[in-house]
Amino acid sequence: MIVLVAGANGRLGGLLVALLLGRGHTVRGLVRRQDEAGALEEIGAAAVVGDLRGDIEWAVDGCDAAIFAAGARHRAQLEAIDGGGAAKLAEAADRFGLRRFVLCSAVGAGAPERRQGPLRDFLAAKHHAERRLEHLDMPWTILRFGRLTDATGTGRISTVVPPGTPVTLSRDDAALAVAEALDRDRLARRVVHVIGGDRHVADALDAVEPAPLPPVYNSGLGAGQADNPPPDPEMLLPDASPLDADVDYEGEGPLPPELVGNDDPAPGIP
């Protein structure tokens, strides 16, 4: 497949590009600046330069699949990038009839209104993107990751979030989960939690039988579409997000790299 990866110059995105190339895919890496293109081209990917806040339909044209692994690097940019940027890429993919779309989201995005503190903004932006996907016809998959780490991957995950327990996931295993999900049509229109665990990634994803993404809650983050929507599994978790532990995120400065997609090493967008 020809796969577009948004956020290809981040730590997660870079691992994903290399993994997809190794599996025989043709990869387009969407980056913000021309000087970020060289590293992708050196490993055999095609680099395309664009801003997720602007017109990006041209980047999707000719692709078979797209992956959103990008993220804002400052709190003030969260809604424009993690929310609106992801939704914009998904809508472009839908218009061009792409076969697959994978959104890298986060544990806690199913019910951000229940969270306290600064992580709520991050999760609310992810929630916005997830809800926009619900209205699209293409076969999308949402992967909600635990707190990302640089630990060596084990190739094993869990798709069940234990209540009240901080959850983590290595970037290696996050990238592997995305690559495996991309090849599984049965995960179309499914939301899957992915955290560190003890099952091989392929086996864990093959065993997933989640409910489709529920309608939006009347929570101030969007208007519901059903009188009694089925609850998102995260509504059953304790109020404290498993993502909260060990994440230092305050103020308007740079976001911590533990947050999904917010690990781009390049300077912040003006």
Regions picked out by a protein language model, each given a short descriptive name:
Residues 4, 28, 48, 141:
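Conserved beta-strand positions in the Rossmann-like core of class I SAM-dependent methyltransferases
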Residues 2, 9, 172-270:
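Mid/C-terminal beta-alpha module of Rossmann-like enzyme folds, strongest
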Residues 1-25:
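N-terminal Rossmann NAD(P)H-binding glycine-rich loop of SDR-like oxidoreductase domains
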Residues 23, 43, 136:
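Conserved dinucleotide-binding and phosphotransfer motif residues
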Residues 72-161, 166:
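Glycine-/Pro-rich loop/turn segments that contact NAD(P) or position catalytic residues
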Residues 29-88, 92-95:
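NAD(P)H-binding glycine-rich loop region in Rossmannoid oxidoreductase-like domains
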Residues 2, 64-65, 100:
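Structural motif
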